[in-house]
Amino acid sequence: MAAGSVAAVLLASLNPAAVAGGVDIGDAVRIGDATLSRSDLVGAATSVAERVAAADRVAVLATPTPVTVLAIAGALIAGVPVVPVPADVGAAERAHMLDDSGAQAWLGEKPQGTDDLPHIPVRLHARSWHRYPEPHPDATALIIYTSGTTGPPKGVVLSRRAVAADIDMLAEAWQWTPDDTLVHGLPLYHVHGLVLGLLGSLRIGNRFVHTGKPKPAEYAAARGSLYFAVPTVWSRVVEDPDVARALSSARLLVSGSAALPVPVFDKLAELTGQPPVERYGASETLITLSTRADGERRPGWVGLPLQGVATRLVDDDGAPCAHDGETVGRLQVQTPTIFDGYLNLPEATAEAFDAEGWYRTGDAAVIGGDGMHRIVGRESVDLIKTGGYRVGAGEIETVLLGHPGVAEAAVVGVPDDDLGQRIVAFVVGDAEPEALINFVAEQLSVHKRPREVRVVNSLPRNAMGKLLKKELVGWL
């Protein structure tokens, strides 16, 4: 979209002049029983902007409420960076986020029983029609805290330019337009729920429905055209065929934030007639890969680079790996959506890039000759080096999930004096461990079979449904 047009404005749909001219949507945002028209959004968010314009940064307790929507929109209209804080975060982690970010106030809601920062409430019925100048595209929009494997969460600094670019790139790939109704029940403090779901809707101008929690029945009742969910939610959707079939009128079903198991992909496609769209990204890069609305959707693969994105695979020594659909390498990307760095951590920022400016994703992947990407998993836990072979945990997990006695599966590598690492699988289900070992050996190369299978009641996951594999290693 051309600079200087309305698209140069980050939240392009919140245009006071257009609303004053009669361009309005009565249900632009719906959260539970609450509804905000576009006129409500513009007037109330601009009123918020007037109250926070002098701040350097504000923290927003990211509950799925109209107050949160108006707080985030108002701060961005004023050009004030937003620090979204999970409502269920522990006191120590919250204190780190506030101290590290330099947030000067809670905007909107604040945690109960805390007086760590001044509080600026959001007035739902206040209105202002002042037109703020659009901040520079390089100005910071968001500081999103992402948990690493060691140390406290790091603040990922995202510019307005990066956020706008990613939404526009996805709009092209997904044929996302103002005619869509986007539905999700995801947290508003991560890329998936906040940047894509909420800010994407406020930029594109489509209707946005947040279901409060990602309950399948709520998804079915929303009657959207574009749905966002994590694999855990899609797994629950396919467990209720009536709910799944209610989504058959949707245009796109998008899965992300973790790998979508192939059996869930297949069942969702069967019940809805819609093979789901998978995409890949990170807080540091936003979304960089996706299958397309008009392209192939292949189970287990996350698609092609979005417009403007370049990817490559390298080995342990930094040499290029073949894009042959089989060779596993370390995934690196270059993208216009790249973050501006980790807040207050220049050394960690420098370490995230190689000498040529490629961002090290930390993920192992395979790239096919057609450019399609398959994510094997995190280098640290999903790339297993066993007996001289490099084995992707995801490939084994896919096979295990194809066994009728397995509901969930996670594969890790653990230190082994003979093999370097031995493959261990954790499964939820009623299959016998020895039968699963033989099942994998029959489907894949023998060296990819688990040396041990443990049947457990559940697998550890975070709020976004991602497996916490380092916890599994600790179980051994």
Give the role of each language-model region:
Residues 4-8, 19-24, 127-145, 152, ...:
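Conserved pre-ATP/AMP-binding loop-to-beta segment of ANL
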Residues 34, 49-89, 390:
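Conserved AMP-binding/adenylate-forming
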Residues 35-39, 141-168:
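Conserved AMP-binding A3 loop
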Residues 60, 106, 335, 340-341, ...:
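AMP-binding/adenylate-forming catalytic core of the ANL superfamily
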Residues 164-181, 189-225, 240-241:
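Conserved AMP-binding/adenylation subdomain of ANL enzymes
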Residues 310-332, 351, 369-370, 431-433, ...:
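Conserved beta-loop-beta connector loops within the AMP-binding
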Residues 323-339, 358, 364-366:
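AMP-binding/adenylate-forming core of the ANL superfamily
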